[in-house]
Amino acid sequence: MQRALVSFSMLIAFASVSSAQTSKNAKEPLVEFENMTWAEVKQALADGKTTALFYTGGTEQRGPQNTNGGHTFMGRATVKAIALKLGNAIAMPVLPYTPNNASATLPGTIGLTNELLTAILERVSEQAITTGFKNVILMGDHGGGQPTVYADVAKRLDEKYAPQGIHVFYCDSVYAPAQDDFEKELEAKGYPRSNHAGIFDTSEMMYVCGDACVRKDLIKTAVGDPVLGPGEQRDPNAPRVNNGITGDARRSSADIGKQLFDKRIEYATREIRRFLGMQP
């Protein structure tokens, strides 16, 4: 396990160097840990930026129209925006791998196990605490069973460090709650149902990184297998599209992506402020 953690630390460092999310605007506060010097981190802590924001991205196939690093690209933009809006936080490097399984049919996914993610989250959280952060926030760009991992790690570490006045929280509203509410808004406007690599993922990637991560010429044919509602089962006689898309992404746009992105930031900052006892 220790060797695995060391290997992933090296991978994360490599990913950080290649990050396109840099603070180029001189007037914008430095909030990305990987783009700061140790002296700048120390000063930020002294100035009250004592909340560390950890966000997990992921390397996963996202249909023929989206690049495999979409979770990570969106994660970098999201966690930076949250840090800027909070004003008392630092965005830590985004983890580019999360629990998943590779496939030769749809090659694009490189995944961890839940056990390894647990170990990594515990390690980086405690490293942030050693660095001087008083609050650690865990967030992820995934649904499924992964939120349980974040919640369990946060609960365990919070119980361990609370006697020292240090807290660890899991912020879940940034992903499913924000997306579910936005999905209802779109459906009310006549947009088709969508899920993985559908209108939400594609639109948000168009807003965050545009041509760098979305093949816009393929959006017009970006339709996959249908989204199943609660209790629905797939028709065994219906042909499978199996192109990595669930739903319909053909009406994707950067404008829709911005609306979803802004909702994520709104939901996350509201929940984190509640954790920290700040005014909403």
Which residues make up each language-model segment?
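Positively charged n-region of N-terminal signal peptides that target proteins for export
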Residues: 1-4
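Extended, histidine- and acidic-residue-enriched regions that form the cofactor-binding/catalytic faces
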Residues: 21-101, 105-115, 119-137, 141-280
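Bacterial N-terminal signal peptides
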Residues: 7-16
